[in-house]
Amino acid sequence: MKPIKFEALLKNTIWGGNDINHLKQLPEGTKAVGESWEISGVPGNETIVTAGDDLGATLPALIRKYGATLVGAENFKRYGETFPLLIKFISAAQPLSIQVHPDDAMANTMGHPFGKTEMWYIIGTHEGARLCSGFAHDYSADAYTQGVEDGSIEEHLAYHTTHVGDCFFIPAGRIHSIGAGNFLIEIQQSSNDTFRVYDFNRTDDLGNRRELHVEQARQALNFKAEGDYRTHYSARLGEASLMVQCPQFTTRLIRTEQTMQVDYAAIDSFVILIAYEGEAKLTDAEGNEVLLQAGESLLLPASNSALAIEPQGITRFSCVETFIP
């Protein structure tokens, strides 16, 4: 089964920047894109195939057609026709709302299959870029309620200056916000459940404020502080370097200036590549070839056992790789 590209869903947001527009070389005058949903099976937001025999098919339709060949036997048994991950580029000119996501158990009570554990990999920053991940100290539900009422909750959050290459793991229940000036790749469980705690009193084009979910957020939040919210990893050129490993996904960083081989024989899962620098010719174990350039994402079927990555031109090729462990 051949590698698959999808048409990204471009989302205009009140906080969106221009980094996605530039990376994807969108036409001049295109409204700022805050989010690009690269690969999605979220109902109502399914990405569609851009070429080949399955041109125009949605991701859920592909799973129905190919089953375990596409997603892996264990994934098909566990998730059925529901694709378990959602892949995005995010560009923020203004801070996103302070928010939290539910875990699987809470999401199930809402009738949804997944909570939302996610991670961020920073691929670009502007002056003063920072983000919020977690509380600066142990907090409590009562203090949270008071902090929301009097507006002091921001004083209790852990803020982090960001740089290209930074990685943050955001488990369900952790309060967080992407700050202005960040351009990042987000890998998350396939869920659109977000509980907004505070949205900086912003209004949309019609003058309306976005809905807050203060009580649901209180139920979802983990109020215990961590000592270090950054994810530390060691990256080397020409290798698939581990960044995040959790029950929901494994994510590795691939950067190379020459042809490299990646072995997937032991992985019973689809593999997603999200390219953010350069261009490469990819050749799978069956000899299928495809070009992948910065701003594009690719789904490798679980039936594929290996991949050759050959950078094109004189630039380095860099991508984030993720799959289900």
Briefly describe each language-model feature range:
Residues 1-139, 201-227, 251:
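Transition-metal
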Residues 80-82, 90-95, 104, 125-128, ...:
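Ligand-binding loop in jelly-roll beta-barrel domains
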Residues 87-88, 96, 118-121, 159-160, ...:
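His/acidic/aromatic-lined binding-pocket segments of jelly-roll/cupin-type domains
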Residues 100-102, 123-126, 135-137, 148, ...:
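Short, structured patches in soluble enzyme cores that scaffold and shape functional sites
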Residues 132-155, 185-227, 313-325:
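Double-stranded beta-helix
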Residues 157-169, 284-304:
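Short acidic-glycine-tyrosine-enriched beta hairpin
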Residues 195-267:
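C-terminal amphipathic alpha-helical segment
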Residues 260-262, 278-283, 297:
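Short beta-strand segments in beta-sandwich/barrel cores
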